[in-house]
Structure formats: C-alpha cells, structure tokens
C-alpha cells in the first residue's frame, strides 16, 4: 500500500494510469491495499478497465498517509505552498480570537511551547538545533492558539490539518537559521495574546506567516 501510495503522490503514477500489479505481492494483500487507496480517493476500479489513478481533485489531501507519501516530491512542494496560503487566511484571525478569549491555562500552555522552542535552538555541542524538539514545540504553540480561540469549529478544523502543519514545520525548520529567525515573531504573538491585544496578535501572526511563506519559497527554489 505504502509503495503504491508514494508512487501516486510523487507523480510516478499519474491520474488515469492503470495501477500495476507488483509481482511479489499476493492477491489478498493487493486487494486490501487497493481498498485503502480507494477510500483515500487515490484510485478507482472499473470493470474491464482495471484500477486507475483518480484525478488529484479526488484525493483526500489531509489524510495522514497521503501527506506522508508526498514528502520530497514535486506535489509535496505544491502542497506546502497551498498549505501556507490556508495558514495565511486562518491563523491571523485565530490569533486575534485567542487574544480575546485565552484563559490563564491557555496562555501558560502557549508559553511553555514557546519556551521549549527556545530551548530546542539552544542545544549545546555539535548540534545547534534539535529539529524534532523544535517541531514538536512549534506544533504545540500553534495548536494551543487554536484551542485558545474558543471556537469549536476552528479547533476541529485545526485538528484536521494538524498532520499537514507538522509537514510544514519540518520542511521550514530544516533550513539553517530558519528556526531561530522565527523566534522573535513567535514571541510577538505570545506577548500580544498575553496583553489581550487582538490587532497586535493578528499583525504578529501575519508577520510570522510572511516569514513562513519566504521559507517555503526558498525550499521550492532551485539550489
């Protein structure tokens, strides 16, 4: 299943193409794999035609496996760009709501996440950045802001795109210096939420989203 999924998501198998039958896979295993891929909107079976790759518009793009399979491919770069556009639309408004509605516990949670981000960029020795720790803390920072918004629909939407956000965090954190450069922007968001200044929180998040967009464009640009 994972092998076929990666071939589809990285463009090796294109929409309309017949899905090949691997010689080393049993019929039972293949049938189960195709059942899962069908549920994710990636393939469809037709009588006398076989199983073909469905159009990208049918794919469940926020599915955890679908997100994982497209890492490193051209479609992954396009997905990161589109995800950044979604974040630019949603996260500034979310930060403004959090500045109005965050409880003391919410603020403490966001603050802890920020402190952990700082700690992850202050590793001693050869490793100047603990990428895994930074990504985890960055994820908790943004998830905490979504919860602090007090909007249940927005919170559920945030849970839906969480796996995709982790992909974005991992991609933009790997560039040397990018994580540390983002810290002042995260701090500005936290301070605005603490001070209960929705307009400042919105502006600070917009600044962070602009920074993120630049990092995504650097990833996409030829080296």
List the predicted regions and their residue ranges.
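Structural signature of alpha-solenoid helical repeat scaffolds
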Residues: 174-177
